[in-house]
Structures are given as C-alpha cells and as structure tokens.
Swiss-Prot record:
CDD domains in UniProt: HTH_MlrA-CarA (cd01104)
InterPro entries referenced in this protein's UniProt entry, alphabetically: Cbl-bd_cap, Cobalamin-bd_sf, DNA-bd_dom_put_sf, MerR-type_HTH_dom, MerR_fam, Meth_synthase_dom
Organism encoding this protein: Thermus thermophilus (strain ATCC 27634 / DSM 579 / HB8)
Biological function: Negative regulator of genes involved in carotenoid biosynthesis.
Record GO biological process: carotenoid biosynthetic process
Keyword Transcription regulation: yes
Domain notes: The N-terminal region interacts with DNA, and the C-terminal region is involved in oligomerization and binding of cobalamin.
Domain HTH merR-type: 6-76
Activity regulation (UniProt): Requires cobalamin (vitamin B12) for repressor activity. In the dark, binding of cobalamin to CarH induces its oligomerization, which enhances binding to the DNA and repressor activity. Light causes cobalamin photolysis and disruption of the cobalamin-CarH complex, which decreases interaction with DNA and allows transcription of the target genes.
Coiled-coil annotated residue ranges, if any: none
Protein name as catalogued: HTH-type transcriptional repressor CarH
Length: 285
C-alpha cells in the first residue's frame, strides 16, 4: 500500500485474486474500475475499489458474467451524500440486507465517527420526525430504530474499552429512550474514558450497588422525557456515585440540582468535565 492509502495493481491482484490483465480489460471494456494514475501512468486503486472488486469476484463465483456483475454493482452504487436517503428507504421497505450494505459503505467512506455524524444520527432524526408527522407507523419506526440502534452498539464496541474504574452510563428509571445514553458512552470511550453502558431504565438501587461494587466514581444519566425525572424525589441521584451527571432534552439545570446531580448541557466537554473537581460554581457542563 502506498503512503497515501491506495494500492498498486499488483497489490490489488494479490488482494482480490483478479489478475492485472483482467483488471485492465474490465477498465477498457466496461469503464470499471476507474483507478487514479500517477504522473508516470501507473494505476492506483482505493480501498473502496478493492472492496467492490471483491464483491464482484464473489458474484462471478456464484455464476454471474463479468458484464452482469459489474452492471449489478454500478446499479446499486450510491453517492455518499445520498446514503441517508437510501438507508431510510431501505429500512422503511424492510430491506435489512440493503440497509446493511449502505451502512457498510458509509463506514468505509467516513469511518466510525463520520458514519455516526453523517448517516446514523440524521436517519434516526428523520425516522423520529416521520413518525411524529404520521408518515410511518409504530411498526416501521421500531424496525428502523432497532436496526440503527444495533449499528450504534457496533460502533460503541469498536471504540473499545479503556482501562480504569468505569463510568456507568444509563437512563433514569422509566426512561426507555437510550440513544442519548449510547452516544454519551461512545463519545466518552473515544476520549479514553472507560464508559460502561448498562442499557436503559436502570433501577436506582441496582445502579448504586453496581457503582459501589465496581468502584465507579461517576454515573452519567441521559433523559429524553421529563416525566420520569419529575417522579423522582429530591436528592434521588445524589448518592449513586461520588459524581453524577444528568443531561438530555428532558433534563435541565434546576431539575439536576433538585435531584443531586451535575447538569450536562451537551456531550461536548463531558469527558473533560470528568477530570475537573465538582464545585458549586459549576451548575452546567
């Protein structure tokens, strides 16, 4: 592989099992692949080219002709800026295989953080808005959200788990919306914080006991709805751990203060806030 992250034709030949002669023949005959050229005229293939060629070779092994396999690949190719629309449409028609292929394409193109920002979160928002507008039913919303939540869990797993006493991340009792908590755990892990995501709707006594057993110095709670928070008594979060952060659209500074937590305005700066001592002057993070 060259220093710029692309491959020579010899490397592609070894990686795909397709000969250099075949690659040049396809380029002349079908206009695919379309490698870049060095000033000296040598072909350079991207990682996406390599993945495409592996897919096409698999179809050839299944009995397709080169022409049919290349046409099939080009027909399904989507520009990065159109991936969101394609993913949403695939989910709403129940095409999970197609949705998975689009997610993988986005992951290859943007990487984990980029696919989260440019694909998963926009599609999640659009699914929620479509449900609120009455354009899709509960079943479609559940299907799409389940797929997207699973991909977010995959990104969370890819982020690894840094060493050290864990930071426990969950939602308050009665709060089933977990995307905000998953995002908090993901961003903390990317910042080197050992965030342990527990899932949603964790009973406070169990959360308190786990924090003590694992030696967790911090608990982070994300709330989308305000009702579960209002149902909690004053100081309910105070002794979950030495530090407790509460955030999300259902929370606010005054409610956090009432419950005995530090208010987390957004995810930006949360990791840094974990290293700062708690003080009365820090009512919002």
């Amino acid at each position: 592989m060259t220093s710029s992250g692309v491959y020579t034709i010899a490397e592609v030949e070894a990686m795909t099992g397709l000969s250099a002669e075949v690659l040049r023949q396809w380029e002349r005959r079908y206009g695919f692949p379309k490698p870049r050229r060095t000033p000296g005229g040598h072909r350079l293939y991207s990682a996406e080219d390599v993945e495409a060629l592996k897919t096409i070779k698999r179809w050839l092994e299944e009995g397709a002709t080169p022409k049919a396999a290349i046409r099939r690949y080009l027909a399904q190719e989507v520009r990065p800026e159109d991936l969101g629309t394609g993913l949403l449409e695939a989910l709403l028609r129940g095409d999970l295989a197609g949705a998975e292929a689009l997610f993988r394409r986005g992951l290859r193109f943007w990487g984990p953080e980029g696919v989260l920002e440019h694909l998963l979160l926009p599609v999640l928002r659009e699914v929620g808005e479509a449900w609120h507008r009455g354009e899709i039913g509960v079943a479609e919303e559940h299907l799409a959200s389940t797929f997207l939540r699973a991909r977010l869990q995959e990104l969370l797993d890819l982020a690894g788990f840094p060493p050290g006493p864990p930071v426990l991340v969950t939602t308050p009792p009665g709060e089933r919306h977990e995307i905000g908590a998953m995002l908090a755990a993901y961003h903390l892990r990317r910042k080197g914080v050992p965030a342990l995501y527990l899932g949603p709707d964790t009973p406070l006594p169990d959360l308190r006991a786990l924090a003590r057993r694992l030696g967790a110095g911090t608990v982070v709670l994300s709330a989308v709805l305000s009702e579960p928070l209002r149902a909690l008594p004053d100081g309910a979060l105070k002794d979950l751990a030495p530090r407790v952060f509460l955030g999300g659209q259902g929370a606010g500074p005054e409610e956090a203060r009432r419950l005995g937590a530090e208010y987390m305005e957004d995810l930006k700066g949360l990791a840094e806030a974990l290293w700062l001592p708690r003080g009365p002057e820090k009512e919002a993070i």
